[in-house]
């Protein structure tokens, strides 16, 4: 017994009396309710119960005892009545609650139609659709929703009095854009043994339908969503809508179903549609209806209208469409013996060749599938010639064909792939074998398959219901919602709401897998964001449109950048500049690609480019966008470099090349029409040729009757391209005052500003006038040239101008050698160089103008003693004066530690050979000192000076080597300690808190390039103060930057720097030690020489063995790079980010991580001492 709550309050306006009735007013609620007729005669009067998907509510359809009509009541789990439907006349017994919970479906027989109606849970009607039958033709037995609420199955029976002879069928309906589509119609005929007894959807597989018949026959139907589209022509896509096929030509119009470009009207429900797979052209469309009639439509030039093909949303009265429509060629029947094998025997219909179709069938009560070869070259109305070409163990669930390779792939329910060989003398079916000799089998069965060429091999691509994408035996991605193949591209949509466009050309399966699973780069052109739930419908052939469909049914057109660039490159390869330009302009592709794609082809066909583009505005747009950047390497890189740089491009600049080539073509084609574009070509050069452009404007003004563009229009256009002040200055630079006035009149300048200046210029002599203009425009070189032409009276002003602008080299070119002006310029130039402390060059300049005294002083200051003696000779100095000069210069050379040069001066010019010998001994030039000793027979110096100097030098070297060895060893040991501390800190093994420690951020051998923020802040502030100090203080601060103080933040850097300096300093002593050893041996100091050689050899050996320890490979490869990846830790990631912040420090100190090189080419040892 069911207990019901009596007083039920309906919220939300569920009662009709509380509803708004519009213009009828509240009186409408008081109108007398019409009497509703009782339930239909064939109604079994049994109640129907249906539950909502979540089990919280259920609905009951029952016949009222009082009125005899059916009503729907909604109850909750506690048996509390929630609502009662309105009294609906003709309401039938069928009842099904949509699992998603939105609607309750039932059926209604109306006076003029039969409908499926929907109720909300409050009992009010919410929408309906009409069944494609006449009044009283059928009766609705049951309605069933599939588990994901996307398909509504309707069980229908003929409304015959004799039930034993009545037929039955099942229709599958879907909804999109608020329109209901009849997608499939399954006719079970009138055979009593095939009459349906039970119909149900699979609870797990949403697209599997189970049917049981009276004769104990069991049928299982599996469906998958697919898109029927053409591969060429107009980009046609077909949608099944009951007895109509809606066809949209996306090349002509993008309209979402149920709208279409045209539709094909059939006499009964359509079950399958297939296009002839011919790339780049519309060839035909074949339609298989529920009565197994195959209708073949072909595209052609026929002008006869086909009554079955009607225009849709893109046309109407008074409108014409450019879309091509097909014409019915013939209708053929499937043979009855084939149709009677099993219900809807033929499926997966595919049009593979002109008169050839493929289809598959399933044998009753068997797992054997048969592949059928269907020939359709018969006459209209005849049976199709069907031939079995092979059987496969298993249920074939997909079939795909490639018109390029003529291969066909079939997939069974276990994922195994079979190949249909249609090109063999006898068609056959065999397992698909890959290049490794393995059978291809998807890990899971796929609902969509396609054939693609990858690495020169045909591979099968498959997508499962769970978004897993397979290529042959490999899974390449697991988040794919749809895919589409277009030429060499694989387009995919993903669960992350992106659309990828991947080129299959010159790629491998491994690279493709890596690309699909890698994180997207912000600048990656192969990926773009799309709306949530988007699915690919088609790509319009020979265009850039990619059509996506949203979950609610509406369409979106996008132009994926990879597709756009590929199409543009094809147009450019075919020299279709206009198509490429218009696409680039519309989709905002950089116009530099027109040239950069193939510079040689562009320059060779620039006349064709001008002819195709034709528009002055378009050519101006192209010229203004040209820049030096090669966009094929920066913005739009390709794997295969298609560009071929011209030989001219290697020398000249790209902008100049393009401007000159385009201008030459325009002047050849029609200079009057392209006048403004020619001006643009002058302005857009690397160095704008504004004077020539202005001269062109002036020519237009001189001959206005012969031009299309007036001078005023041209000048206005130039003012649009160039700043008015800049244009005024360039017009002034032409020295044409008429042109200057013309530009000034078009500007906003006040005549009081420029007229007095122009009047003053007109009164000047021509050269001086031009000098004044160039000086005003700061064109100093031209001004200097014009001033030099004014004559000797203006030379004083000329020289003053040279000094002011430092134009000495330019001035020297304007006067011949030997003239007074030439010498005066040289003298002034020499004075200028002396002020810049360029003494040697100043001396040369003075010497050229015979200012020998000044040249002598300059050479003395520069230390060039050879030229000093030359100048002294020219001045005819006396012997005493030359000796004094030699002593002065020698003293300066000694200060510069050039004792050998000073010794030459003292010996040859001052004749003080003894002082020369002492200087040579001081500079350790032992052999040269010996030469002078024996030359001047001063053997006493051997005992008094040479031998003591030798012993002192040996002793000093010994002390130096010991000090270097001690210092080097100490620094090396300290570096090991510092590195060990920082390695422990990196591994987190130190007990104390390392956050505030100075070494806390130094976590590896080379981590000293990542300085702590405290230290970096300290040194950055220090550097800002250092910038204003003297060079001496800057060098001092630089030395203090890396402190050797223990515990300093950069101690390891300081140690590396000190060790490298020690090695380099000692390595440079090889030659000095070699020379000292020779002289020690000469004077029989063998023991001291051997000791020196051994100590130096030990020091170098220490350096050589220590370098790999101090600079291991990990240090030289900069292991402080970001530590990321699966083995990274929180500390390492933090360090990586800190490394990026301190990249400048790493650049400055990177040389410290390179080991110093020892010069082993110098043979410094003496074999006598070994």
Swiss-Prot record:
Amino acid composition bias (Basic residues), ranges on this chain: 1031-1043
GO cellular component: cytoplasm; cytosol; elongator holoenzyme complex; nucleus
GO molecular function, one term: tRNA binding
Residue ranges, annotated region (Mediates dimerization): 722-1170
Keyword check for Metal-binding: no
Region (Disordered): 1014-1045
Top-level taxonomic group: Eukaryota
Pathway recorded for this protein: tRNA modification; 5-methoxycarbonylmethyl-2-thiouridine-tRNA biosynthesis
Annotated spans, Required for binding to tRNA: 1028-1046
Chain intervals with Low complexity compositional bias: 1018-1030
GO annotation terms (biological process): tRNA wobble base 5-methoxycarbonylmethyl-2-thiouridinylation
Subcellular location: Cytoplasm; Nucleus
Keyword flag tRNA processing: yes
Protein keywords: Cytoplasm, Nucleus, tRNA processing
Function text: Component of the elongator complex which is required for multiple tRNA modifications, including mcm5U (5-methoxycarbonylmethyl uridine), mcm5s2U (5-methoxycarbonylmethyl-2-thiouridine), and ncm5U (5-carbamoylmethyl uridine). The elongator complex catalyzes formation of carboxymethyluridine in the wobble base at position 34 in tRNAs. ELP1 binds to tRNA, mediating interaction of the elongator complex with tRNA.
PANTHER family linked: ELONGATOR COMPLEX PROTEIN 1 (PTHR12747:SF0)
Record note on quaternary structure: Homodimer. Component of the elongator complex.
Entry's family note: Belongs to the ELP1/IKA1 family.
Protein's recorded name: Putative elongator complex protein 1
Gene: elp1
């Amino acid at each position: 017994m069911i207990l019901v709550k009596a007083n039920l309050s309906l919220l939300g306006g569920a009662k009709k009396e509380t509803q708004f009735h519009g213009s009828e007013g509240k009186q409408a609620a008081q109108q007398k309710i019409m009497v509703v007729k009782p339930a239909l005669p064939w109604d079994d009067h049994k109640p129907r119960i249906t539950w909502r998907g979540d089990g919280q509510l259920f609905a009951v359809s029952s016949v009222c005892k009082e009125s005899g009509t059916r009503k729907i009541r909604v109850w909750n789990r506690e048996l509390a009545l929630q609502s009662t439907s309105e009294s609906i006349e003709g309401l039938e017994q069928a009842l099904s609650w949509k699992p998603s919970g939105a609607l309750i479906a039932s059926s209604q027989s109306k006076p003029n139609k039969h409908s499926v109606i929907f109720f909300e849970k409050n009992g009010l009607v919410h929408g309906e659709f009409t069944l494609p039958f006449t009044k009283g033709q059928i009766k609705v037995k049951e309605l069933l929703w599939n588990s994901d609420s996307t398909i509504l199955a309707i069980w229908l029976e003929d409304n015959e009095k004799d039930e034993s002879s009545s037929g039955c069928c099942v229709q599958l309906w879907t909804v999109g854009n608020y329109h209901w589509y009849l997608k499939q119609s399954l006719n079970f005929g009138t055979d009593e043994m095939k009459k349906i007894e039970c119909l149900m959807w699979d609870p797990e597989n949403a697209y599997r339908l189970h049917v049981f018949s009276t004769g104990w026959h069991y049928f299982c139907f599996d469906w998958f969503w697919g898109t029927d589209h053409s591969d060429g022509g107009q980009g046609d896509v077909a949608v099944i809508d009951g007895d109509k096929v809606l066809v949209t030509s996306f090349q002509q119009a993008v309209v979402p179903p149920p709208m279409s470009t045209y539709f094909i009207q059939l006499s009964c429900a359509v079950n399958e549609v297939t296009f002839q797979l011919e790339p780049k052209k519309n060839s035909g469309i074949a339609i298989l209806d529920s009565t197994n009639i195959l209708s073949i439509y072909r595209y052609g030039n026929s002008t006869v209208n086909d009554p079955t093909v009607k225009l849709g949303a893109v046309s109407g009265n008074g409108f014409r469409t450019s879309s091509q429509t097909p014409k019915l060629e013939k209708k053929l029947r499937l043979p009855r013996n084939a149709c009677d094998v099993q219900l809807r025997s033929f499926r997966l219909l595919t049009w593979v060749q002109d008169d050839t179709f493929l289809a598959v069938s399933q044998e009753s009560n068997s797992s054997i599938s048969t592949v059928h070869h269907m020939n359709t070259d018969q006459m209209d109305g005849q049976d199709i010639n069907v031939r079995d070409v092979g059987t496969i163990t298993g249920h074939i669930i997909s079939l795909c064909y490639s018109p390029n390779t003529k291969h066909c792939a079939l997939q069974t329910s276990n994922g195994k792939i079979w190949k249909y060989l249609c090109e063999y003398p006898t068609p056959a079916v065999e397992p698909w074998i890959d290049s490794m000799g393995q059978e291809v089998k998807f890990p899971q069965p796929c609902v969509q398959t396609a054939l693609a060429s990858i690495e020169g091999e045909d591979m099968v691509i498959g997508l499962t219901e769970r978004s897993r994408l397979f290529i042959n035996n490999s899974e390449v991605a697991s988040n794919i919602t749809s895919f589409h193949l277009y030429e060499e591209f694989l387009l995919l949509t993903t669960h992350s709401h992106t659309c990828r466009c991947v080129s299959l050309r010159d790629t491998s399966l491994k690279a493709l897998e890596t690309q699909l699973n890698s994180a997207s780069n912000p600048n990656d052109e192969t990926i773009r964001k799309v709306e949530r739930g988007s699915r690919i419908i088609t790509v319009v052939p020979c265009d850039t449109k990619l059509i996506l469909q949203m979950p609610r049914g509406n369409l979106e057109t996008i132009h994926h950048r990879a597709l756009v660039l590929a199409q543009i490159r094809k147009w450019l390869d075919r020299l279709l500049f206009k198509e490429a330009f218009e696409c680039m302009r519309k989709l905002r592709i950089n116009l530099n690609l027109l040239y950069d794609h193939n510079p040689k082809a562009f320059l060779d066909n620039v006349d064709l480019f001008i002819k195709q583009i034709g528009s002055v505005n378009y050519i101006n747009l192209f010229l203004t966008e040209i820049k030096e950047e090669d966009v094929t390497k920066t913005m739009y890189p390709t794997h295969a470099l298609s560009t071929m740089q011209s030989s001219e491009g290697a020398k000249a600049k790209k902008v100049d090349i393009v401007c000159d080539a385009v201008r030459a073509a325009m002047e050849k084609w029609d200079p009057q029409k392209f006048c403004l574009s020619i001006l643009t070509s002058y302005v857009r050069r690397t160095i704008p040729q504004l004077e020539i452009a202005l001269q062109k404007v002036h020519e237009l003004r001189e001959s206005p009757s012969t031009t299309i563009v007036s001078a005023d229009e041209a000048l206005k256009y130039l003012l649009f391209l160039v700043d008015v002040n800049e244009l005024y200055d360039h017009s002034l630079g032409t020295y044409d005052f008429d042109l200057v006035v013309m530009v000034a009149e078009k500007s906003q300048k006040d005549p009081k500003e420029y007229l007095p200046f122009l009047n003053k210029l007109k009164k000047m002599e021509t050269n001086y006038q031009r000098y004044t203009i160039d000086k005003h425009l700061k064109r100093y070189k031209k001004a200097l040239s014009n001033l030099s032409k004014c004559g000797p009276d203006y030379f004083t002003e000329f020289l003053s101008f040279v000094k002011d602008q430092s134009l000495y080299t330019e001035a020297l070119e304007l006067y011949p050698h030997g003239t007074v002006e030439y010498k005066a310029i040289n003298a002034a130039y020499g004075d200028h160089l002396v002020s810049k402390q360029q003494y040697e060059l100043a001396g040369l300049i003075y010497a050229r103008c015979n200012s020998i005294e000044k040249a002598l002083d300059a050479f003395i200051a520069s230390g060039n003693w050879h030229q000093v003696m030359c100048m002294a000779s020219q001045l005819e100095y006396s012997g005493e004066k030359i000796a004094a000069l030699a002593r002065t210069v020698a003293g300066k050379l000694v200060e510069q530690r050039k004792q050998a040069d000073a010794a030459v001066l003292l010996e040859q010019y001052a004749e003080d050979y003894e002082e020369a010998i002492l200087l040579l001994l001081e500079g350790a030039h032992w052999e040269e000192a010996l030469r002078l000793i024996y030359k001047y027979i001063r053997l006493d110096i051997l005992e008094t000076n040479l031998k003591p100097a030798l012993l002192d030098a040996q002793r000093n070297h010994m002390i130096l080597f010991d000090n270097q060895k001690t210092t080097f060893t100490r620094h090396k040991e300290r570096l090991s300690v510092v590195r060990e501390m920082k390695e422990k800190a990196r591994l987190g093994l130190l007990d104390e808190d390392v956050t505030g420690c100075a070494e806390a951020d130094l976590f590896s051998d080379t981590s000293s390039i990542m300085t702590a923020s405290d230290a970096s802040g300290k040194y950055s502030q220090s550097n800002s103060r250092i910038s204003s100090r003297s060079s001496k203080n800057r060098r001092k601060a630089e030395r203090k930057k890396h402190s050797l103080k223990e515990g300093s933040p950069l101690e390891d850097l300081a140690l590396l720097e000190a060790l490298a300096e020690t090695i380099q300093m000692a390595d440079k002593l090889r030659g000095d030690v070699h020379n000292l050893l020779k002289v020690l041996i000469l004077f029989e100091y063998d023991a001291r020489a051997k000791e020196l050689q051994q100590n130096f050899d030990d020091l170098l050996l220490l350096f050589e063995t220590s370098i790999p320890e101090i600079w291991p490979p990990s240090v030289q490869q900069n292991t402080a790079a970001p530590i990321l990846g699966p083995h990274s830790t929180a500390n390492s990631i933090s360090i990586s980010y800190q490394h990026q912040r301190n990249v400048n420090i790493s650049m400055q100190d990177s040389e410290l991580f390179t080991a110093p090189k020892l010069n082993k080419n110098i043979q410094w040892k003496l074999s006598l001492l070994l």
